[in-house]
A protein has these predicted regions:
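One-carbon transfer enzymes
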Residues: 1-184
């Protein structure tokens, strides 16, 4: 999807091999890897991570495949300005331990007929923030976790994440308590 009224201030990954870093480099976008593994303590990592983000002065932080717990003080500072994409229709198959292929394995084990993706604001819980957009994807006979993961990415995640960013960038998203409304 197309995203208007935005400029990417930078890309941070906790994985030095993330394609996002390479893609950012190719386009002249500031990028860096900051991983908890590279620091003596979680507190030091949190400080360095927050410093790196603050330097970029973002209006919106987009988490996509960033599998690190965000520091509470950062969530407070960027309240309703930090979003995440999750590969399920929250509140199903979400929370601690539900990421990547595990989400799709559990969905297939449970025998659900519909899965999907959710874009939500980040709060202090895991996948508990106000929901911005969701898109459903049908489970097909014979799906494997890998096939289902790919279909959810292509039919849902890659569509609703850019749309959510565009809506936020253009002032169309309002948060009231735990509910999100979208202006037309």
């Amino acid at each position: 999807g197309e995203i208007t009224n935005t400029k990417i201030a930078g890309v941070i990954s906790n994985n030095k091999n993330a394609y996002a870093l390479e893609r950012a480099e190719k386009h002249g976008i500031p990028n860096q890897c900051i991983s908890p593994k590279d620091y003596e303590s979680r507190e030091i990592f949190n400080q360095e991570f927050m410093k790196a983000v603050d330097v970029m002065q973002p209006d919106l932080i987009v988490l996509a495949g960033f599998l690190v717990v965000i520091p509470a003080e950062m969530i407070a500072k960027y309240r309703n300005r930090m979003i995440n994409i999750h590969p399920s229709l929250i509140p199903a198959f979400c929370g601690t331990g539900f990421y990547g292929l595990k989400v799709h394995e559990k969905a297939l084990e449970r025998g659900v007929k519909v899965v999907g993706a959710t874009v939500h604001f980040v709060d202090e819980g895991t996948d508990t923030g106000p929901i911005i957009l969701q898109k459903a994807v049908e489970v097909e006979q014979g799906d494997t976790p890998e096939v289902l993961q790919r279909r959810v990415m292509e039919q849902a995640e890659w569509r609703i994440l850019p749309r959510a960013i565009d809506l936020i960038a253009n002032g169309k998203v309002k948060v009231e308590g735990h509910r999100v409304t979208i202006e037309s």
